[in-house]
Amino acid sequence: MSDMADAPASDERIKQTSALRKALIRPELGGICGTVIVFVLFAIFAGDSGMFNSQGILNWSIVSAQFMIIAVGACLLMIAGEFDLSVGSMIGFAGMMIAIFSITLGWPVWQAILVTFALCIAIGALNGIIVVRTGLPSFIVTLAFLFILRGFTIYLPQLIERKTIIGGIDKAAEGDWLAALFGGKILKGLFTWLGDAGIIAVFERGNRAGQPVVDGIPMLIVWALALVAFGHFVLTRTKFGNWIFASGGDAQAARYVGVPVNRVKILMFMFTAFCATVFATCQVMEFGSAGADRGLLKEFEAIIAVVIGGALLTGGYGSVIGAALGALIFGVVQQGLFFANVESSLFRVFLGVILLFAVVLNTYIRRMITGER
């Protein structure tokens, strides 16, 4: 007995994971490193160009928020093991529907927004139902909807208005309670005080002399932060979040333990459509118009942001915070190239390079996690 008690029990001990290894397998690692590198580079090459004053910060924050809104939906869907290539077309379609309902048909803007949300979420549900019922790859199904929605977005305004851009939404939205939730600003009083105190810049001449250059936080940014917080909470603090990981990691095993995989996937398609419609509504309220070309390539930008944030293309692994950091990188780089006087078309080159790098890094991380060689 004593010999057995004294025998080494190394085979019964739980293998400890080093702190370094834990850090390396965090999905946010790539996003964190990329964010630091991007900020350092632009601080060096564009630091004196106004990129980091109040107006410059607002500019790249708005662009980042746009990417962030659609990246949250794409992130949760990819973790669940699916893709949605119709996101960009959904943005254009949703914006056009708001314009047609409110301008052409004369509906109140709040009603046009609500009906558009219902319509787009229903289309997202249809995407999900087709995928789970037929077993077809979501890549193919949503690629089909990419063309269907874009086709309707071009055809309908031409049929009804004989043009592909419908304006006048800003005037129709004046005083509308729901439009203000997508196109207004918050904390205006705070920024007025900051301007009066000399903390932020104010206009020195013209009709706005004495007023702060930044007069509030756009609702676009508020929506982005709210969706990131919501997505992170659901993914990391709820049972449904565990279901999302399980559905993307091993759908068959998840079914065996009672996870409603099909329902999870359909709901994620619906949430992705919701995020795209939020983006479209904010965009329409900002510009006061809807255009048939809105949202082009946004589906790929959303996926790239998610991959930069550490999500695996195979599903079952990822982070909403990581996706948000990927979106932040996009916004900073897109605006930073302008401030650094670099040709803006190189932004597409950056997207391709960073996507390739992120996929290679994520593949290495997956092999570390699974022990593959």
Regions found by a protein language model. Name each.
Residues 38-45, 53-105, 109, 129-136, ...:
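Single transmembrane alpha-helix segments in multi-pass membrane proteins
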Residues 142, 146-238, 290-292, 370-373:
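Transmembrane helix-bundle core of multi-pass membrane transporters
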Residues 1-44, 198, 256-263, 333, ...:
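Cytosolic-side transmembrane-helix boundaries in multi-pass membrane proteins
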Residues 269-270, 276-280, 286-352:
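Transmembrane alpha-helical segments in multi-pass inner-membrane proteins
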Residues 20-65, 281, 285-293:
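Helix-loop-helix hairpins and the membrane-proximal interhelical loops
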Residues 31-44, 74, 147-154, 221-232, ...:
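Hydrophobic core segments of alpha-helical transmembrane domains in multi-pass membrane transport
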Residues 27-28, 138-140, 165-172, 216-223, ...:
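Loop-to-transmembrane alpha-helix initiation sites
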Residues 108, 112, 116, 122-127, ...:
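Helix-loop-helix "hairpin" substructures at the membrane interface of multi-pass membrane proteins
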